[in-house]
């Protein structure tokens, strides 16, 4: 709970510094960057101070600062693929943006604003994925594969329900959300924004599946396969964007994200099933049935 309070404080401080540095100080983009860095630094100091004062079990002792080769190897084996995965995902976003840019400033503005709303309604999926990582890691670590599978099934059930709710909210609140970003008449932008949103919300279930399966595998210590899922996502988005630009179709451009989500979801689902089956075979080999 305390870390959430620090996060809320950091967000509020970020807004306050934005107003002070951009509006009051006239610093523009530099002020926005400085506000973000300062607010995150304050949050990090508060979290570190809380750990040091209130949770001594998490505070490294005098002999615990020396890195151990095995620990470093394990952390890098998971951390590097995760970093590459985020880089690949960001590259896919650049591909999508390049395709949208060809349709003019109205399309770009509408796509950007609708994308903000899309990101907002996706937050529940992201949170569920983070919870699945911890859940799967704990149960996979103690060899309870049945609980891992039950958790994944429950996570996918929640994902389907949430995806439907997010789709309804995304389409219902699109115009009010657009009004927050733009003053005056937004009628010219709405067709672009609504086309993008109406296509994306149909594929929220594959998007939610990505967060479930990717985080489960990462929680179980598998870093390469989630990264490979990011590559599948990038390739699907790239192929769709190329065809969209050649055909000059904004509708096809809006399918870049859904195509990427679907490709990644299928790849990650298949990878998860293979990992679970392999783990079950290894467990049966280690624990042969008792003889009667």
Show which residues each predicted segment covers.
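Hydrophobic transmembrane helix module of multi-pass membrane transport proteins
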Residues: 1-26, 30-33, 38
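Hydrophobic faces of transmembrane alpha-helices in multi-pass small-molecule transporters and flippases
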Residues: 1-8, 46-49, 64-95, 99-100, ...
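Small-residue-rich hydrophobic transmembrane alpha-helices
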Residues: 2-3, 110-175, 207-229
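Residue-level signature of the transmembrane alpha-helical core
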Residues: 8, 12, 34-41, 83, ...
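Hydrophobic positions within alpha-helical transmembrane segments of bacterial inner-membrane proteins
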Residues: 11, 15, 19, 32, ...
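Alpha-helical transmembrane segments of multipass membrane proteins
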Residues: 12-23, 48, 94-98, 120-123, ...
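Helix-terminus/linker motif at the lipid-water interface of multi-pass membrane proteins
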Residues: 20-27, 87-120, 138, 176-185, ...
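Short alpha-helical transmembrane segments in multi-pass integral membrane proteins
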Residues: 24-80, 136-203, 244-292
